[in-house]
Amino acid sequence: ESAWDAPRALSLPGLAEHLGLVRSAIHTPLKELEASGLISTRSAHVIGGGPRRRTVVHLTDSGRQRAELLSEEELPEKSQSLAIGPIPNQIQIRGREGELDTLLEKLLAGGNLQLTGLPGIGKTSLTRSVAELLMERGFKIRWATCNSDSDAFAIGSMCLGKESPRDAVAIASAVSGKKTALIIDEAQELHPRHLSAVHSLLSACAETSTGVLAAVRAPSPFGTLPGFEEIRIQGLDTSDAVELLPKSIGSESAEQVAEALGGHPLALHLWSPDEDIPEKGQAVQEFVQSTVLRRLTNEGLGTLDELSLSPLPLSVEELFVAEGISELDDSAVLRWMHSLVEPHHLIRNVRRATVDEEIARDLHSKAAEIWSTREGLRARRIEAHHRLNSGDELDTEWLAENVATISLEDSAAAAVLIDDAIQINDDENLRLTAIDLAFERGEPDVASEHIDSVSDSPQKLLRKARLARQHGDLQEAEKLEQSALDSLSPADAVRAKIASLVRAHDDRLPGQPTQVQSSQIGEVNLSRLPKTDLASASLALDLLRHAVAVESGSVETLANVRSSLVAQMGEDHPRLALIDL
């Protein structure tokens, strides 16, 4: 209790969030508990909550004794945690008994459901509650929360708790099982680049015996999902909605507020007793704009803008306008995912729509400059997003280089960036980068679409050859590749030939013999390359020559190649240790 840091769960916003109540509704009960000597309050630094000290609540000795006297029947039943993936903390929900019963019954029967509703209507809370009921019945929950960089592989990895297969059918098989439910939340956040692949994943999952629940904002980007039943949730009934509001405002006023806001849970959390009762029939988005955003200070709006324009949730430490984080948290504007934070999507969407385009571009430009000073692939991904939306002239060479770097760690994010870039500037080099990335991701259909949009050139022929090879048409691939090599400069032809040989060896199914012959490697004429490229080209060919010799069992070739590699890399190079295994 004397520690400098306190967890957010002990702060007033954290307590209100867990109880499913508006912030003002917990003031009176807390005062009564404190007056009874059951709790104490103090100011402390909240972990991940910004630099300002905030009120936190602790049980006193008497409070602990009272809590221990509670019978087991009075305590909420705890299920054994059977969740895999980033499942959010459970909060208490009100007035959803009918929806809960329906979802539970259908998932227990192995049904596939698409849960839709307006932003902030309570889809995640309802989904989390039904997950708890399933776990109480011994079900394993595989949970994925989507963002703009999520693809089928990322969803599979979240649900499995480890690296996922790439193929949709293989993922569906891996996540299915007896007494298992698959939950995919925030599906509307998926980028159009990955929508088709995730649609295929959901369709594959629908063919298994495992129940699937996809929670998505209406209208769903999937439209109608084959094999899925759509369940749409509405606002709370007035009798349930008033339970979210503080008792101090009186039952008549509470009913007026609940009816005016259509029983919308998030809107009710955002309303303050210090404000007038909203106009009946006022759209929730209009209420957010005219009331919630208007009452924020410049500090609060500055932090909200930074969070709203970011492509991903941020930690408080990553914010460069962090002064307003406490105000936003106190106003129930934020949703927390452990150490990361973002605005509730309803508020984010309204803020994005209301910020003047020129101001938004300026904010993106400033954010890009700040992120450019930070290290790491996450920084490059966020910087690239801001540069794309800044309205500044796009440096396509810089973007292509960074996309290639980002793809080494997160090819899904790289695919989103290159797709967004092409929407802004349909540059030939960006298209070629998109084609190469699609090949690396095992998406020949995406590569084919981009190839059709590229003008005729040797580079296009090389990629058409690769597409033909992936489709198993080796004769056509050889023909296209030779045509491309004949059109390239001598040095570029050598580079392309080396790359083609490496891909021909790598792009094959496990267990299939290599199609590369030692004689093909020996035919590459390195003398056509500039001296600056000789060392790297020679090393690439020797590594390929060694891999081919391993398969053919040529002991003499292996010995000769190893000697060459030692001369180029040194006897102590770690790659040699791997080669010798």
Language-model-detected regions and their locations in the chain:
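Conserved phosphate-binding/catalytic loops and adjacent sensor/switch elements of nucleotide-binding enzymes
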Residues: 128, 135-179
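P-loop NTPase Walker A phosphate-binding motif
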Residues: 116-141, 218-219, 323-326
